[in-house]
Amino acid sequence: MRRRNPAALKPPRFPILAFDERELRLALGSVFNLKWLVPGESLVSILWKFGCANALAADFLVQLIDPDIDPSVGVAPVREVVNLMRLRRLLRLPENVLHASLLDAAVPGRYHPAFRYCRQCAAHGYHSVLYQLNDEDRCPAHRQSLETRCLHCGEETPYIVNASLVEAPFRCVSCHSHFSYGRLSLLSTTPAMRRRDRAAISHRLRVRSDDNMDVPRPEQRPRSPADDLRAMRR
């Protein structure tokens, strides 16, 4: 019987590298579109759409935001805590959009600790940073009172970016009932939100940015010749 060469049984000198298939997929290119967002969209709302579009597990997405935190604990969505550069590399969105999606920790007591929502906006897959301000009581687009408690179980959802919140898009973290009037599509809010509703939200953001420093001014699109023509006709 032929004996095997002992040298052939030695382990290879190079290491066998393990990789995460999800990280490789994101490195090759994530799926996201700036047109899916409405002005003033919160980071929580953005992450829900990003996670849905790229089929990411909630705990994995939270770790991508900050690898040093426990996904079950999470991180507060405020500018002084979240690494904006890391967030920009992950989501591939303009810095001003991400800056506007976060709260300002320099203004204590101004924000509600529970997730506040408009049921109609939730039906369109939208949540605004405006809704977390204590002195904002109604949605500027639909004039509905902002809710904090689930209409099914009565519990509140903490406004913290953790695995429990990320895995429940526009749903209660306690009972997983929808905050909206029914199931919704997360991939785009543009077709669902009427132009006048988007304009009302943008107007309210501009008013808040003029009066306070806690809400950045929404991004302005470049003027077109059609805009100049309409201005001349007024």
Regions found by a protein language model. Give the residues of each.
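Short, cysteine/histidine-rich loop/knuckle motifs that typically chelate Zn2+
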Residues: 120-121, 138-141, 152, 174
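Secondary-structure-rich domain cores
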Residues: 121-123, 134, 155
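A structured, charge-rich N-terminal accessory region that forms the first stable segment of a protein
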Residues: 1-114, 119, 125-127, 192-194, ...
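Domain-exit/linker segments immediately C-terminal to small folded modules
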Residues: 147-234
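Short, flexible, mixed-charge glycine/proline-rich loop motifs
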Residues: 101-115, 127-133, 140-146, 161-167
